Amino acid sequence: MTKLTRFSVAPLHAMTRRLADVASGRVAPEFVITGARVLSTYSERILPNRELWITGGRVAAVKPAGAHKALGGGFAIYDAADGIIAPGLVDPHIHIESSMVTACAYAEAALLNGTTTIFCDSHEIGNVMDVAGVEAMLEDARQAPLSIFLTVPSTVPATSAALETAGGDLTPDKIADLFDRWPEAVALGEKMDFVPVCMGDERSHAILAAALQRGRPVSGHVYGREFVAAYAASGVTDTHEAIDRDIADDLLDAGVWIFLRGGPPTTPWHSLPQAIRTITELGASHKRTAVCTDDRDADDLMLFGLDWVVREAVKAGMSPEQAWSMGSLHGATRFAMDGEIGGLGGGRRADLVLLDDGLKPQSTWYGGELVVENGKITPRLDQALSQRYQYPKAAYATVKLPAQVKLTPELPTKACTVNAIKTALPGITLIHDKVAIAPASDWPTLFARHGLCFVAVIERHGKSAGNVAHGLLKDFGLTRGAVASSVGHDSHNIIVAGTNEADMQVAVAAIGSHQGGVCVVADGKVRAMVPLPIAGLLSDKRITEVAEEVKLLKTEWAAAGCTIPYMGFNLIPLSVIPEIRITDKGLVLVPQMELTPLFE
């Protein structure tokens, strides 16, 4: 049996004569899907009484129902029973690593949810393993039963060596080389350092040039209306951070695509309803908007895929036809691939989804092959998922912790001010809270009064002699033990929070023993652990197994009292999002891009 990958379907230029013969009825198709309503993303209508003629993994034509009868026989027929046939979903902005699984494992959940193409920014593994990590994920993607394209990581590290230690450093020359050697590298990934871009930083603009010289589009990530004009003038043409009405207005009129990000209500990515209202209240066209998932853990990916985002868009006021187009054709159009994916026109890949009236996927075809039927993966897909890429040995040895170091700071006995990191739902923006401490030696009482707990970040790439930075979280809610993660965005050093030194040490040791992971510790015991041995970011298990591990982690996370989800906790070191962060170098004041002491 041949492997099921993106390459299973021949390129269009090699099939045009065959497709023309089938479309005109001179040659029979390989199979026909009949009795369907077809969702046209081109006209944004649902067309009744249609059938699709498929050959070579591509759509030859959409015909009136029953047209195949004039051909005689010799082809398979699939009866859609008046269900809706729509093009497979296209996710224009995701990070596979957030799901903590490999590209091949990710494909299972994506196809179950009707997603057949993704545009992945692999800056997480790039921050750990540099080019070698990005290329390993590309090799993984080539073997996956899913169309995966790379938006080349543009901001590795997220800031500078003065503010944090990363494992990777993707220079302009390295980025140019990735574009030149990998056809899958179709765009530049989100340019998160929008302040340096707008200020004319030389390195940032050299990276932009590496993409623009090659005709590749540039993806973005920007906060603040004051930056929009300079950002757009620098060549950035999409962003997924536009939920405020005024900045969305500015971005649309500056020619910047807006990806409306949808996430479960319990995560930092729950912004879709507000984002949709922004577009509808502006009276703006949705033609330059698409929907995306951005980040999903393994558990949420199974339940809240891009199909869920589309349905949420309908709830927020879009028509079903508009919403599905935003989830398919628009993402394809943004990356100039609408001649291949995103619709059911002749010549397009036969990436198809059978929907019920609520836009819930029932069955999925990938390149004309049935991979999900009645909500279950087929033997063909199961076989493809078992042929997983083997990551190099170096990927299993990226957590290089120093000898035991102190994880809590020396607490002053004199009056001081604490530069605390105040957490709040959904967990993206962190507030710089200056907490005045009167002279006292009873710190446990002060911790309870002010809602404080310890936090530390430990350098794990073996580069900075085991840097450890200490901080205090406010309102994180942790009432016992410790929590730790090797997925501390974006440099992915170890972040640990706790109520006491002993449990914090146990948590960090557990991360080290598994070469990465996320864990909860109480009373000296590991209560939940998601091992992530590949680059300290990815599991080597099937997504269903990882999803079960994540469910237990979430249960124990909540039992520990944490007020923001673990994915929000992973963002605490992300030094490009306001207001205050902690990295292995110390506390970072983001607007000023400078370090500040814990106690003043």
From Swiss-Prot:
* Keywords for the protein's UniProt record, in alphabetical order: Hydrolase, Manganese
Pfam families in the cross-refs:
Adenine_deam_C (PF13382), Amidohydro_1 (PF01979)
**What is the enzyme's class at the highest EC level?**
hydrolase
This protein's cofactor list reads: Mn(2+)
Indicate yes or no for the key word Hydrolase. yes
> What domain of life does the native source organism fall in?
Bacteria
Substrates-to-products reaction catalysed: adenine + H2O + H(+) = hypoxanthine + NH4(+)
Q: Which family is annotated?
A: Belongs to the metallo-dependent hydrolases superfamily. Adenine deaminase family.
Name of this protein: Adenine deaminase
**Organism for this UniProt entry:** Bradyrhizobium sp. (strain BTAi1 / ATCC BAA-1182)
Gene behind this chain?
ade
